[in-house]
Swiss-Prot record:
The keyword Transport does not apply. It comes from Sus scrofa (Pig). Residues 1-26 form the signal peptide. Residues 66-100 are annotated as: Disordered. This is Parathyroid hormone/parathyroid hormone-related peptide receptor. Glycans are attached at N147, N157, N162, N172. The lineage of its organism: Eukaryota, Metazoa, Chordata, Craniata, Vertebrata.
Length: 585
């Protein structure tokens, strides 16, 4: 079995869930603030009061026969209708018996809209879904006495209601809080580590001119998109969580929820939500640009492999516009639609189908990048089979293919597709916890992995750092010896007994000499320096040594110094393609 047979199987295994789950959510980050919770409560109150007005205006005989407001007794087996959330008795039960006497009138208790209550029965209503932290599988209960009045709490002038099933998440939240605290710690540490490592990587690639080429420019854009994504997440969290949010709401009791709901709806000022809306907008934009620069990396590598003639400088501008400009278009469309049709809160909650304006382009980039990844892995497997034809060691082929695949996975964001087919479920579910831990871990540390693989582990980067370190240590050693006035000075590990005063301006002072390049041979008692000529001339003739970059398995393999120079059309793609093969082989 050849190594090339792995690619079709891998494509069949992974493409099916990707293509069949384009409806899945991407980086759902709904944050419920206290102000938004109050808004939802008041909206539910307005809807309830409208319905109450319609019902109370009907004649008494219509009210008593209206099953839409009738509630079932606890003695019968209830049947819940999901559309309306009301309970009806099973067929065969005497529905007329529960209307004997005066029914309890429907009302709004600042939490729930209660229907007509049958005298002497307990009314059960599903916990409202507009209370974010309620247990939406539970029920709230009220009792209607035989006089047609809602039962009061003994010794208190208020209506009795049992919300214990609804508030169980509020009173028994230790496990859930531990999960959220752990997830918050994971992504905070991950994005912090990624931000620090990516900052160093960008500074390295920008500082060394020999590393300036199209490939590294694209890497720098990708690194910058990861950095801006991390910063935008920190800013968004600081803005949204600066006031009273769910941390406070989770500790609220039923009475405190009532007090919040009874408060008048605060006036919505145009400037009250500007800060959080700007933070959410920039977060969504930088999130989208990060996905699209990952796609740009895939398109660039795919173009080098499959395009015979590829102008890097020309396509660099196109990639730049694609990576930064295209996300700005659909994010601007989303902002316009949200401001026009759903201008409520901080825009952090998904407003129906409007979320697809941003999520569909992101999902498309993930699917397209995964297809490019599968195609490149297929070509790698084919090349491995051709180069190792006639050899019996298939395990080495598999190891090379696995290594190449693992190197490409962070660059192509392959981990995004693992849970694409899995919808978000209950917080207490095991699958949800596994999914969130996986996503928080890999999404936050992806920038760190990319910086390690494509910068710090790159041979050319390491060579440039070693050269710079050698220059700095050599210059420092000369300065130290010059200040001390010693009769000896060192070139790296070797010591010359020539007086410092005999070192002229042409003796190579401060040249980028690497200690490992200095041979131990001596001439006339002096060490033989690189490019040193025998003294037919009175002064040493030295030239800066050229340090060859070691062969590297990283994506940055090969010197950038010759990549952007003019070359003939047939020669240029072959050189680039060979470098990319050495990247992943």
């Amino acid at each position: 079995m050849g190594a090339a047979r792995i690619a079709p199987g891998l494509a069949l295994l992974l493409c099916c869930p990707v293509l069949s789950s384009a409806y899945a959510l991407v980086d759902a980050d709904d944050v419920m603030t206290k102000e938004e919770q109050i808004f939802l409560l008041h909206r539910a109150q307005a809807q309830c009061e409208k319905r109450l007005k319609e019902v109370l205006q009907r004649p008494a005989d219509i009210m008593e026969s209206d099953k839409g407001w009738a509630s079932a007794p606890t003695s019968g087996k209830p049947r819940k209708e999901k559309a309306s959330g009301k309970l009806y008795p099973e067929s065969g039960e005497d529905t007329g018996s529960r209307h004997q006497g005066r029914p309890c009138l429907p009302e709004w208790d600042h939490i729930l809209c209660w229907p007509l209550g049958a005298p002497g029965e307990v009314v059960a209503m599903p916990c409202p879904d507009y209370i974010y932290d309620f247990n939406h599988k539970g029920h709230a209960y009220r009792r209607c006495d035989r006089n047609g009045s809602w039962e009061l709490v003994p010794g208190h002038n208020r209506t009795w209601a049992n919300y214990s099933e609804c508030v169980k998440f509020l009173t028994n939240e230790t496990r859930e809080r531990e999960v959220f605290d752990r997830l918050g710690m994971i992504y905070t540490v991950g994005y912090s580590v990624s931000l620090a490592s990516l900052t160093v990587a960008v500074l390295i690639l920008a500082y060394f001119r020999r590393l300036h080429c199209t490939r590294n420019y694209i890497h720098m854009h990708l690194f910058l998109s990861f950095m801006l994504r991390a910063v935008s997440i920190f800013v968004k969290d600081a803005v949204l969580y600066s006031g009273a949010t769910l941390d406070e709401a989770e500790r609220l009791t039923e009475e405190e929820l009532r007090a919040i709901a009874q408060a008048p709806l605060p006036p919505v000022a145009a400037t009250s939500y500007v800060g959080c809306r700007v933070a959410v907008t920039f977060f969504l934009y930088f999130l989208a640009t990060n996905y699209y620069w990952i796609l740009v990396e895939g398109l660039y590598l795919h173009s080098l492999i499959f395009m015979a003639f590829f102008s890097e400088k020309k396509y660099l501008w196109g990639f730049t516009v694609f990576g930064w400009g295209l996300p700005a278009i659909f994010v601007a469309v989303w902002v316009s639609v949200r401001a026009t049709l759903a201008n409520t809160g901080c825009w952090d909650l998904s407003s129906g189908n409007k979320k697809w304006i941003i999520q569909v382009p992101i999902l498309a980039s993930i699917v397209l990048n995964f297809i490019l990844f599968i195609n490149i892995v297929r070509v790698l497997a084919t090349k491995l089979r051709e180069t190792n034809a006639g050899r019996c060691d298939t395990r080495q082929q598999y190891r090379k293919l696995l290594k190449s695949t693992l190197v490409l996975m962070p660059l192509f964001g392959v981990h995004y597709i693992v849970f694409m087919a899995t919808p978000y479920t209950e917080v207490s579910g095991t699958l949800w916890q596994v999914q969130m831990h996986y996503e928080m871990l890999f999404n936050s540390f992806q920038g760190f992995f990319v910086a390690i693989i494509y910068c710090f582990c790159n041979g050319e980067v390491q060579a440039e750092i070693k050269k710079s370190w050698s220059r700095w240590t050599l210059a420092l050693d000369f300065k130290r010896k010059a200040r001390s006035g010693s009769s000896s000075y060192s070139y790296g590990p070797m010591v010359s007994h020539t007086s410092v005063t005999n070192v002229g301006p042409r003796t190579g002072l401060g040249l980028p000499l690497s200690p490992r390049l200095l041979p131990a041979a001596t001439t006339n008692g002096h060490p033989q320096l690189p490019c040193h000529t025998k003294p037919e001339t009175p002064a040493l003739q030295t030239t800066p040594p050229v340090v060859a970059a070691p062969k590297d398995d990283g994506f940055l393999n090969g010197s950038c110094s010759g990549l952007d120079e003019e070359a003939s059309a047939p020669e240029r793609p072959s050189v680039l393609l060979q470098e990319e093969w050495e990247t992943v082989m």
